[in-house]
Amino acid sequence: MSESKPRRPAYARLLDRAVRILGVRDHSEQELRRKLAAPVIGKNGPEAIDATEEDYDRVIAWCYEHSYLDDTRFVTRFIASRSRKGYGPARIRQELNQKGIARDATEQAMRECDIDWGELARDQAVRKYGEPLPSEFSEKVKIQRFLLYRGYLMEDIQAIWRNFTD
């Protein structure tokens, strides 16, 4: 006769899942809540955890209390990661907003980060269009559109030609 193990309480299962999720990389609270609420793929297919809203709140509080969840650390690392991938401040702000980070926390982290956005914009333009950067109007417009899409501010884009005319 096969004896099945009794199911662990929903809180314990949620807590295990939260620690596993946060062990891979930092998440915002909103991201963690979304991932915890998603069904778990088990041996018998997708399976929802029958947890209450109080269970989710307790897990989130535990994660904050034990420093598994830290929005300041998440924002700082996210800005560094996205800037290394060549994205500008406007795009990064928008992505952080989508992840549920408060605007004031985002702005404070953007002020504290040590990134020269003008230099980063120039590096992205050179990587895409080569050195020296084209000086024809139509090519400048292409570069401008590309950098705006990547999230750079117009003043940083215009500074490329103003400061690096060589």
Curated annotation (Swiss-Prot):
Subcellular location: Cytoplasm
Pfam family membership, one: RecX_HTH1
Function: Modulates RecA activity.
GO CC annotation: cytoplasm
Keyword annotations: Cytoplasm
UniProt keyword annotation of Ribonucleoprotein present: no
PANTHER family listed in its UniProt record: REGULATORY PROTEIN RECX FAMILY PROTEIN
Family in the record: Belongs to the RecX family.
HAMAP family (UniProt xref): RecX (MF_01114)
InterPro entries: RecX_HTH_1st, RecX_HTH_2nd, RecX_HTH_3rd, Regulatory_RecX, WH-like_DNA-bd_sf
Protein name: Regulatory protein RecX
Gene3D superfamilies per the UniProt record, alphabetical: Winged helix-like DNA-binding domain superfamily/Winged helix DNA-binding domain (1.10.10.10)
Source taxon at top rank: Bacteria
UniProt-listed GO biological process terms: regulation of DNA repair
